[in-house]
């Protein structure tokens, strides 16, 4: 097809006018049209939240295809795999529709080819592109195409540690070992080993991986801050800060004297206030830095007189207490800043004195890092295993050093498109530059939604182009998409009100002006006063907070407030739970949130990506078990195992065993004491009673058998042996959240198996890997389980990006920002390089022996201070963007939820606004989102803000006030008042009579088991008799049966029962890896993992199982593994017909496929049979029970049921 010319500016303008004058219900905006059709230059689309950027991107691609561009000529980068999939699906629909609409034969054929090529198009993440690229061109760098990705963090950590220790030993024993020893000691802290240094090395390495050339950055930028250090200018800056701080203090005190101080006319502190004002008043325009520093020193000294209470308003009058508290709080804030400035004077002096020494240390660090980076790179090349960043680095290296490859891609790509451009890092930016011809880039993003700095994303890449294109259109075209089609006017007005007053270039990195303000464009949503955004504050006093912290089970007031609003939406407005989202900045308080919601019976679905797998109790128990098997001399792990439900030793028993020390030993560990107790070889052997001795013997025997088994079997087999020997897997399944716990244990076995398949073998290395993951403060992802269909969504703000919900609650507004990065021993900056805290050894000059002659002083380098300030501004800017993302997720109504004392907050004072923004100090001193929102509410009271704040106290959060949806546990304890003992025997006898009457009336309910299995409830379904493996072929036909008089087989040969075959077959079907092609060889390998005897394995017909996957149902399962659930436990309430009491049914479903409006349930049976109808009749009731459980769980009525019959020579699939 011949290329059709792209539209000119005039043609685009005509198109915009025509769209504006059209009668369409939902019109494209002029900016959207411009973004879709503009061509011939670099284009940056700044697309605010809900402005339809995905629509614009898809329409632009479709327009190019319709003009004759091939889909293979477009490079389209998305932030996630999911986004790429969604874009491909959207394009598939649009191209198909265009084919149907057009009459142009050439266009039809062209678009048909594009549709066929769509699966192979360069649409995906940068990582997916670089993998394909390196697979094709890696030979240029001698990289084999069969490389693998180090996605397993634990494996990566093991490799990293091995390389670190190799490089460490080389430096520790090398020619520069003295200077290296100094570096080592600088990061040792209280420890005596290399862990402190190793932690900083890994941190720097992660940073280097985000640069386009790590070694180049190390050599050119790592020491830049030391090279350009200017202490004279720093002293001048500090003097300016001191001036400003003293003037702020003067303004505060004068305002206080002119207003509130009149209520405290004779208070003693006012004399000191006047004294300080006189000191500040002595300064003038001629005062130099020395004068300002002297006044600062005298002011700070005055504040410290009278044990620091010289300026404290100590009024005890109840009516004046709020005024006094507000003054004291602001005074503390002011003097905290003055104290910091005073400290900075001293620190700057030390920084200058030790600058050269710190520089030398940094050079040593630079050398070590360079050697480590190169050694680790070489090690990964030996393994032919790389991180994603390595793949990108090699891709850049090829594109830079092989012009013919670069030019071929530049000629191939008509346009280089990137979505979520604000989250691009420097590697990706360099790659995009190399793939582009310089004027064919299309970049879409929103700097206000850049929230991935922790992944080394740099919003300044976007911001630099935004500023450049805005000032000089010749550089590139800037298009602003501001119209929001997602949210109500109430949500948008509230968001604008917040960020117009909060975000600017100084704090926030951008000016939130008319270029960034959200514009309401969803004509389907009419204004509704009920949807006005609310800032809800749980009114807590100090005692209330203390009470809350006393017990984990007591619900926080903040969550009760949220639950009350959720129930109000659900019950009064008919809002479905799934329309409500709870957003948090982190998952640290998720346990409290989940507890509160469950107590009120509110279904909840989490984002499923908590990296706290190793913290789950059941996994911790198993890890301690493995530690003990590896080395029983570890007391902590041994006690954990003995106290666990697997063995159940209590504190009394452990105390008795801990006293079993041999008389001739000074110190013994617990395991040795257990051996002593077994041998009765201790002076305290009398403490070991018979029951304890038997319990101990059982424990020691089992532990010994596990240790022996571990020597000759895989980790996977060992873990399953532990589960089976002590029924631990079954035990955790009966606990609350049992399916998730079982999934965690199952995943532990799989992860152990994966570990041993990645060239690492043995229990010792597995435990070391886990300990290293924990030591590095990492964790593994938790295991996802099937969520409820209608449930409140609980997720982090990061996870919510790109999603939308009718009702959004932003929780924990009072949760402090995470500032761990600014407390590190090392802070890095792309501009300044390394900032480090230097440990100086200083002489004290002490003469007395009891005083130390030297002390160690931690001195942050000048670059460290500069980087710290840069990091603080970047962190606060990112927190603002995080709040923006959260607020713009709401479609109808937004709730911002926090807590605080109304009495204290109402009297809090803030500096006046400047240029319509909060004072920069107010913004930078905020500890959390709530501080910003409250300051805006107070400073801009007269502005009629589009959000209102409301305090909710304890009296409004009683059970009665909250609502009636709570579901009380049937085992809930009665109050002590109900259990009081009777005062008289007569009353006691009356109570006994009542109990007897009650027991008689409810005998059926008392005798009813509280938990039953499907086979136990045949009173409901008589045919339900789950007797897997029982032979029913020829049932009832004894005629003609040959009678045998052979002697029974009394040999010791292992006998195999049908039940054993059935159990093993089920486990095999559960273990089969459906992501790989199934062959007889792969099934044989999987069968080896099944926990059973070889005799049972020999009875399983693998050909038959392979044949099943060739059936219609088998093929459907293979094609829909993302919808497949296998071995799924379930529990369901049923009612006993006789007693009319509820009981729990528990069971395990062999498997089912879960679709949007349908479920396909299947169950394997290994029974022998003549006719399939025999098994259908037998198991019809059981499947009906499973059907009911699934229907109730997912609210889906359409359920197909199949029996997979494996009891004959050929497999049969029967629909029930």
Curated annotation (Swiss-Prot):
List of residues binding ATP: 47-54
The record's listing under InterPro entries reads:
AddA (IPR014152), DExx_box_DNA_helicase_dom_sf (IPR013986), DNA_helicase_UvrD-like_C (IPR014017), DNA_helicase_UvrD/REP (IPR000212), P-loop_NTPase (IPR027417), PDDEXK-like_dom_sf (IPR011604), PDDEXK_AddAB-type (IPR038726), Restrct_endonuc-II-like (IPR011335)
E.C. numbers:
3.1.-.-, 5.6.2.4
Q: Which UniProt keywords apply?
A: ATP-binding, DNA damage, DNA repair, DNA-binding, Exonuclease, Helicase, Hydrolase, Isomerase, Nuclease, Nucleotide-binding
Per the record, the GO terms for biological process are: double-strand break repair via homologous recombination
Any idea where the UvrD-like helicase C-terminal domain is? 515-802
Q: Does the keyword Nuclease apply?
A: yes
- Record-stated family: Belongs to the helicase family. AddA subfamily.
| Protein name, entry field | ATP-dependent helicase/nuclease subunit A
What gene is this protein translated from? addA
